[in-house]
């Protein structure tokens, strides 16, 4: 019986709950599954199931994340919830759990707190496109005016981080009362999910985006030419199409004369495929790991960018000691290490930071020694002698 309802005939959207510790993110997640389960659109997950999330490792970083899934009338959702603040930081920066949108949970009893702000900033930096606010614990506040003040405060806060604070839906909920089955609060969860359905845009499918493949390896095939292999990150490439080779050296154009997968010839390769592309008029020495093959004009190489970085703790295999501006690590971007320099560290309020400790979450400005294809929202690792010491996401391209 329960098996039938998860047919994949609805658009799939990835979301998560974010917000300050103890504001009720996990309880709200449980409440959503409880309310939707009554309509046969979810399996009930209780607080303990979600809170006891197993550890996962993403690029060597340990993250606790709970994954639940449910449906509304129009969509299928995968929802992530993390037990601890550090897990959110790591999750959002590494992109371990991609979010097309998020439910910002804020307790009406407390209003916005330190991590409320930090999570909004993180959402902005890592490119979470849309938020919906769940004003939680509203059953505990008798005075409607207090709730209105908290709502105003949240809207101003969102606007200060360049989210559309005036337009974002704010829904008054009580996760606990909804789980206990009180009808008015169950209705509020449905209202929240209706807001999520309408305010969080459906993500563009990878296959509809402009073609990009990072080069992993290059071969010469006698009598046929040069083949670049890799996994197509997005888009579609067809035999006979013109593409650009971008990064490290000057950008140049070529034509794809063959697409091969598992030794078979194809007419086209699409997002997710591991392929070899035969390139016209290209010598083996013209192309190397770390370059990308792209739809012409869709991406340009850059050397200078801002990033949001999580610095690994020593228990995670990171550094044991702090480092300072001027530090020269390797930036691992897509398929290769590029030497660069971290020229500045910036705190949340925009002030300069001298020293960065293992375990910190920080904004940095980086400069690479050669131009590579980087873009906003792209993930990278910071490495030193082959081991990862930081994980980051590009928040802004400078030049």
Swiss-Prot record:
Region (G4): 136-139
Region G2, residue ranges: 60-64
Keyword set, alphabetical order: Cytoplasm, Elongation factor, GTP-binding, Hydrolase, Magnesium, Metal-binding, Nucleotide-binding, Protein biosynthesis
Domain of life assignment: Bacteria
EC number per UniProt: 3.6.5.3
Primary site of residence: cytoplasm
Top EC class of this enzyme: hydrolase
GO MF: GTP binding; GTPase activity; translation elongation factor activity
UniProt binding sites for GTP: 19-26, 81-85, 136-139
G5, as annotated region: 174-176
Domain tr-type G, chain residue ranges per copy: 10-204
Binding site for Mg(2+): 26
Pfam families: GTP_EFTU, GTP_EFTU_D2, GTP_EFTU_D3
Function: GTP hydrolase that promotes the GTP-dependent binding of aminoacyl-tRNA to the A-site of ribosomes during protein biosynthesis.
Family named by the database record: Belongs to the TRAFAC class translation factor GTPase superfamily. Classic translation factor GTPase family. EF-Tu/EF-1A subfamily.
Protein name, as recorded: Elongation factor Tu
Species this protein is from: Synechococcus sp. (strain CC9605)
Top-level taxonomy: Bacteria, Bacillati, Cyanobacteriota, Cyanophyceae, Synechococcales
Gene that produces this protein: tuf
């Amino acid at each position: 019986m329960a098996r039938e309802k998860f047919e994949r005939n609805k658009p799939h959207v990835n979301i998560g709950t974010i917000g300050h510790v103890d504001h009720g993110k996990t309880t709200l997640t449980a409440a959503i599954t409880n309310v939707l389960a009554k309509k046969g659109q979810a399996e009930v997950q209780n607080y303990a199931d979600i809170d006891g999330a197993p550890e996962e490792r993403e690029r060597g970083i340990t993250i606790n994340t709970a994954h639940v899934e449910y449906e509304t009338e129009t969509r299928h959702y995968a929802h992530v919830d993390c037990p601890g603040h550090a897990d959110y930081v790591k999750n959002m920066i590494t992109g371990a759990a991609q979010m097309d949108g998020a439910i910002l949970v804020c307790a009406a009893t407390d209003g916005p707190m330190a991590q409320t702000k930090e999570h909004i900033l993180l959402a902005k930096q890592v490119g979470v496109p849309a938020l919906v606010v769940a004003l939680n614990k509203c059953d505990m506040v008798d005075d409607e005016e207090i709730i209105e003040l908290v709502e105003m405060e949240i809207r101003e806060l969102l606007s200060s981080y360049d989210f559309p604070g005036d337009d974002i839906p704010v829904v008054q909920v009580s996760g606990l009362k909804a789980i206990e089955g009180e009808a008015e609060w169950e209705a509020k969860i449905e209202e929240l999910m209706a807001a999520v359905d309408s305010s969080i845009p459906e993500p563009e499918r990878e296959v509809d985006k402009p073609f990009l493949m990072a080069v992993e390896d290059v071969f010469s095939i006698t009598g046929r030419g040069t083949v670049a292999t890799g996994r197509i990150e997005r888009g579609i490439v067809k035999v006979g199409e013109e593409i650009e080779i971008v990064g490290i050296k000057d950008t140049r154009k070529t034509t794809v004369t063959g697409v091969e997968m598992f030794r078979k010839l194809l007419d086209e390769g699409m997002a997710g495929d591991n392929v070899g592309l035969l390139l016209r008029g290209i010598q083996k020495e013209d192309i190397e790991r770390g370059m990308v093959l792209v739809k012409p004009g869709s991406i340009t190489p850059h050397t200078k960018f801002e990033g949001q970085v999580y610095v690994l703790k020593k228990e995670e295999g990171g550094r044991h000691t702090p480092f300072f501006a001027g530090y020269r690590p390797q930036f691992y971007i897509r398929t290769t290490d590029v030497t660069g320099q971290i020229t500045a560290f910036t705190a949340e309020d925009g002030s300069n930071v001298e020293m960065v400790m293992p375990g910190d979450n920080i904004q940095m400005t980086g400069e690479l020694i050669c131009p590579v294809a980087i873009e906003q929202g792209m993930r990278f690792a910071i490495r030193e002698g082959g081991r990862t010491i930081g994980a980051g996401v590009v928040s802004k391209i400078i030049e």
